[in-house]
Every structure is written in structure tokens, then in C-alpha cells.
Amino acid sequence: MPMVLLECDKDIPERQKHIYLKAPNEDTREFLPIANAATIPGTLSERGCLLRRKLVIGGVLKDTIQMIHGPLGCAYDTWHTKRYPTDNGHFNMKYVWSTDMKESHVVFGGEKRLEQRMHEAFDEMPDIKRMIVYTTCPTALIGDDIKAVAKKVMKERPDVDVFTVECPGFSGVSQSKGHHVLNIGWINEKVETMEKEITSEYTMNFIGDFNIQGDTQLLQTYWDRLGIQVVAHFTGNGTYDDLRCMHQAQLNVVNCARSSGYIANELKKRYGIPRLDIDSWGFSYMAEGIRKICAFFGIEEKGERLIAEEYAKWKPKLDWYKERLQGKKMAIWTGGPRLWHWTKSVEDDLGIQVVAMSSKFGHEEDFEKVIARGKEGTYYIDDGNELEFFEIIDLVKPDVIFTGPRVGELVKKLHIPYVNGHGYHNGPYMGFEGFVNLARDTYNAVHNPLRHLAAVDIRDSSQTTPVIVRGAA
């Protein structure tokens, strides 16, 4: 089947190249959706600013001030968008720093303002000695030299270290560019500027995991049981200085390839550290990932023992949910790689049928992976918009949608439940225990009788529809 032109896109026919319906015996290379391309004007894109994706990586660090050099509004989309707990009292979730640029600073320059705010932040947080400074659209347009300011502050304060990220919101087609700039900037400027103590014969960097509701901390229990030292978490529950030591690891394990695969590639090129990609959502994928890591280190028996213990503990609970979710239909509308991380895991481990997928900032390689893993009859959408979501919902009639709150609150008005695939409902979702949590939240969303109230007009005394639909589970 060719690419699909939805009815809502008839006035924007260019959108046809971005939507694919998988059919039998088709060469997916011929029908691969266009991705990582500029949004077509007028399409009500769900994409976000590049600053947001830089903060998704850098903002997770637990010991670092995140200074946003720009108007106060640019600091809105920060710590509250996802929940990144840490084991030091959640420092990164308590504060937002902004230089609060005003019109006069735009006219006359904001470098003095930035310098003042950097000193002020370090004075107010005397125990914090690390900072990342981000440019925004206004400060980039007026040419503020944030690197020069950072060098001046570090010279005046020898005990601090500052990293700058120059990637204003307008400099890419989607937020994905922010990932790339931060990855490459970090390895160019900060990797191999510090050494840490190595305490195990097995060492790795765990790359592309941001500790959403404790993902990193749950997986860390696996690595501890296997005797593997994680040199650096990029960046969930991680520290600024640990990331400076990434060159010391024997292996780079990559979870989210879109946000962090760039630094893994550079570590391989510059230091010869091999890259190993895994999926950590789903029982089958998590077990496969553990086996791959253990095979690299030659500790296969330890890995099999860990997998057996986790299966014995959590598989019966997963099977309970699978029995009750079997045959339900799901749409997955997330950022990029989670499409291909989740599609097969929810189908194989939960018996759910994935009927539509949309990516905000995925690249063509992400669509290659998800289409290869997905089933026939599924819609694949790049940079989907609100009207397309409505039409796709009418076509595939999903029982539940995995997405973020922005789209999630929209579909709730259509009486369709959603599970927060960005910040999670009640995570963690990674690992064996985490996937049981995901199954539980999906079950609760699908079978919650309260959602049936949305279609009931309680003011109508003649309404005969039961307020609570019994036996929905």
C-alpha cells in the first residue's frame, strides 16, 4: 500500500509522505516515512524546542546547576516535564535557574547578566560546584559569548566547572538536534578530564537512561548483582564528574539510541570502547539485554541466575495482567525510539495489539526499526498533528494510548484512557518489576469504570446508562 493521505490532510498533500500503513510483502525502504525534516507550516505539530531535549539529558544530573540564559519563559519546560528522582534528595527537581533576560539585556547584551547570575547561583548553592549553561533563541541571536563568560567565572572560582551548550531552539528541525549538540559537546570538552577509582574487573557506561521515576536505580540493582561497575550513567541519577570519566569503561551499553547514541559512537571512535544496544522495557527484551551484557564480560551463569530469579518473582504477576489485556488495542505516540522499544514488548509480553504509532522527533532509522518490529495493518506517522490523531483514532479505535500529558489530556476528552509514556504514571517501567508496573497502569487505564462517566450527562434525569459499569475488568 502506498503512503496514506488522510482526509484531514487534503489541503496539505505533502503530509502523505509522512504516514505509512504497513501492508503484506512491501519493501519498507520504498515506503519509509520522511522523518527528521522541517515541519510543514500549518500542520499543528506536536514537536518541541531544542532546549527541552538538551535539558532532558543535562537536567537529570543530580549535582549540577542548570542555568538557562534567556527570558524567564524559556525556563518553564524544565524539571516538571518528567520526573527524574535522584538519591541525593532530588536536588535537580527542586530548582530552576534563569538569567531572566529583559528587553534591555537583549538590546545591550546579556553577558554581564549571565556572569552575575552564575555567581549568584554558586553563592546560593555553596555545596554545588558544577553548572551547565544553555543558550536560548534571544541570547543566540544577539551573539552572547557564553563560553567566554564561563571561562571567566571558572577563573574567578577555581573549584567550579562549567559546561556550555550552544543550541538555541531555532537551530534544528526538531528537539532531536539538542541531543546531538550536547552529546558531541560533552565528549569534545569534558570526557577524559577526570579519573575515578575502578573497583570491578567489569566496567561499563549505561547510556540513554534518565531515571524516570527510578528506572536507573532499579536497573542498577541488576548491575550490582552481576558485579558490574557503572562508570557513568548518561545521565539518570548521574553526576557531572562521573560523565568526565566515561573513557575508563570497557563497554558502552545504549538504551535510548536517539538521545545518546552519538556519544557512544564517539567513545568507540576515539577510545575503542565497543557499543552494545539493548532494550530495557519488557521481559523478553530485558532478559536479552542482560544476556548480551553478560556474554561480553563472560559471566553468562550470573546473568541466567539473575533472569531466573526475576522471572520467578515477577512473571506470575505479569501473566495475570496479560490475561486481562489480551487483544486490547493500543496506539503509541511518543518522541522517537520508544516506538520500537515498546511495540514488540507490549505485543509479546502483554498480548496487546499495537495499531498506530507516531513519532515527534524520530529519524528514518527509528522508523526502519519500528516498522520491522511492527505488524501489518499498523499506521506509522512522523511529526503527527492533532487532526491526524483524531482521524487515526476513528480508523483504528484504540482502547488505550501511550503518550505524554499533552496528547493524553486531549484524548481523554474523547473518552479514551492514556498511560503516560513520557514521565510515567506510577513507574519505574524498565526492567522486570518495571514492566509489571507498566502492565498494571495499562490495566487500570483500560478497565477504570470512571472513564465511562465522561459520556454521561448527570443533569439528565432520564439517563438510564449505569453510572458505574460493573464487570468491566
From Swiss-Prot:
Biological processes per GO annotation: nitrogen fixation
Residues annotated for [8Fe-7S] cluster binding in this entry: 49, 74, 137
EC nos: 1.18.6.1
UniProt function note: This vanadium-iron protein is part of the nitrogenase complex that catalyzes the key enzymatic reactions in nitrogen fixation.
Keywords: ATP-binding, Iron, Iron-sulfur, Metal-binding, Nitrogen fixation, Nucleotide-binding, Oxidoreductase, Vanadium
Highest taxon, organism lineage: Bacteria
Originating organism: Azotobacter chroococcum mcd 1
Catalytic activity: N2 + 8 reduced [2Fe-2S]-[ferredoxin] + 16 ATP + 16 H2O = H2 + 8 oxidized [2Fe-2S]-[ferredoxin] + 2 NH4(+) + 16 ADP + 16 phosphate + 6 H(+)
PROSITE patterns to which the protein is assigned, alphabetical: NITROGENASE_1_1, NITROGENASE_1_2
InterPro entries for the chain: Nase/OxRdtase_comp1 (IPR000510), Nase_asu (IPR005974), Nase_comp1_asu (IPR010143), Nase_comp1_CS (IPR000318), Nase_V-Fe_asu (IPR010142)
Oligomeric form and interacting partners: Hexamer of two alpha, two beta, and two delta chains.
Misc. remarks from the entry: The structure of the 7Fe-V-9S-C-homocitryl cluster is assumed to be analogous to the 7Fe-Mo-9S-C-homocitryl cluster.
Protein name: Nitrogenase vanadium-iron protein alpha chain
Top EC category: oxidoreductase
Cysteine disulfide links: none
Similarity-based family: Belongs to the NifD/NifK/NifE/NifN family.
GO terms of molecular function: ATP binding; iron-sulfur cluster binding; nitrogenase activity; vanadium ion binding
Cofactor field: [8Fe-7S] cluster; [7Fe-V-9S-C-homocitryl] cluster
Cofactor note: Binds 1 [8Fe-7S] cluster per heterodimer.
Sites where the protein binds [7Fe-V-9S-C-homocitryl] cluster: 256, 422
PANTHER family: NITROGENASE MOLYBDENUM-IRON PROTEIN ALPHA CHAIN
